[in-house]
UniProtKB/Swiss-Prot annotation:
Family, similarity comment: Belongs to the UPF0434 family.
NCBIfam families in the record: LSD1
SUPFAM superfamilies xrefs: Trm112p-like (SSF158997)
Disulfide cysteine pairs (residue numbers): none
Pfam (any one): Trm112p
GO terms for cellular component: cytosol
Record protein name field: UPF0434 protein BURPS668_0926
Higher taxonomy: Bacteria, Pseudomonadati, Pseudomonadota, Betaproteobacteria, Burkholderiales
HAMAP family given in the database record: UPF0434
Domain of life, source organism: Bacteria
């Protein structure tokens, strides 16, 4: 995932930060408890494509999307 792209992406619902889950290939919004898939290296930032996350679900320890 391109670090420059990750720096500008935000949750389409709340405009909050996203966290990159490398293992699941998803961008996660903790505020809305949604995970947006990354397909072929392209984030799919459509609410209809997002899945609900379970509170407390760990995100890749590599950290938040910013700076990646």
């Amino acid at each position: 995932m391109d670090a420059r792209l990750l720096e500008i992406l935000v949750c389409p619902i709340c405009k909050g930060p996203l966290h990159y889950d490398r293992g699941a290939q998803e961008l996660v919004c903790h505020a809305d408890k949604l995970a947006y898939p990354i397909r072929d290296g392209i984030p799919v930032m459509l609410v209809d494509e997002a899945r609900q996350t379970v509170e407390g679900t760990p995100v890749d320890p590599a950290g938040p999307a910013q700076g990646r």
